[in-house]
Amino acid sequence: MEDFLGENPHNRLIKELVEGKSFTVQLQTLLKQPNESVLAEELIRKIWGSFTQAITVLNSLGNSDNSLTQGQIEEVDQPNSGSELKKKKKEKQDRRGCYKRRKTSGSWMRESATMNDGCAWRKYGQKKILNSKYPRCYYRCTHKYDQECRATKQVQIIQENPIIMYHTTYFGNHTCNPTKIPKHTYNNHAMVKHSDSTVLKEEEEEEESKGQSDNASSIVDSNLWQDFMPSSPSAHDSTMAANYNSSYYEEIISSHDMEDWAKFGEIEAIEFC
């Protein structure tokens, strides 16, 4: 800065403030262009110097009780160098695709062997985590819209052996009337399936047993009726029956007195087949 000794303090103050404003406009334009960190650093130093001179002028014009001491002026931080600006800017930039959740005091974590915590949740998304085998799942309270409950949680598997362990991070407390979930919902569902299959198996066994019983009854009935039903006569049976009938009638006729037959006329011959 030029030495303004002998210059009107009022004009000097105005000039310093105008220069500071001009440097600020230049810096704003420069920040929109890439790879101009050296010029930006120089402008920052000029702006800082202008305001320092303006404060010095005010101290010389004002009452000594209200003026700023030199120590108070030096408390104002020196402008950072270009390398420091780059470093801070780089620290603020997150990796692509990564988002930092706003830090809140109402968050806590827990690790457990189950995801069930007794509250009603609805999953609204999941994301693959870098260097992690398992994705992170995002849940919100089921009553977010009907009761405006803002409670959320993030769940991620952290191990599988010897048992599955879940790492859960909660954000915010429930402000709704929580709907309790049965602790054994999935087990009961499995048990219902098992019961249904058991009943079905018992019914199949009963039908199979009934079918075997019906077959046995039909076999017994057919054997029983065969004793009462006449069977088709064989050739031998037909011959025996013919001989039996012939001898039977022959005995009947021979047992009568042939004289009794004479009154019906002369009988020349009787042949018995």
From Swiss-Prot:
GO terms for biological process: defense response to nematode; regulation of defense response to insect; response to insect; response to jasmonic acid; response to nematode; response to salicylic acid. SUPFAM superfamilies: WRKY DNA-binding domain. Disruption phenotype: Attenuated Mi-1-mediated resistance against potato aphid (e.g. M.euphorbiae) and root-knot nematode (e.g. M.javanica). The keyword Transferase does not apply. Induction: Induced in response to potato aphid (e.g. M.euphorbiae) infestation and root-knot nematode (e.g. M.javanica) inoculation. Up-regulated by salicylic acid (SA) and suppressed by methyl jasmonate (MeJA). One of its GO terms (molecular function) is sequence-specific DNA binding. Residues 110-179 bind DNA. Keywords: DNA-binding, Nucleus, Plant defense, Transcription, Transcription regulation. A motif (Nuclear localization signal) lies at residues 88-95. Transcription factor involved in senescence, biotic and abiotic stress responses by modulating various phytohormones signaling pathways. Interacts specifically with the W box (5'-(T)TGAC[CT]-3'), a frequently occurring elicitor-responsive cis-acting element. Required for the resistance (R) gene Mi-1-mediated resistance to potato aphid (e.g. M.euphorbiae) and root-knot nematode (e.g. M.javanica). Residues 76-103, 195-217 are annotated as: Disordered. This is WRKY DNA-binding transcription factor 70. It is found in: Nucleus. Belongs to the WRKY group III family. Its main location: nucleus. GO terms for cellular component: nucleus.
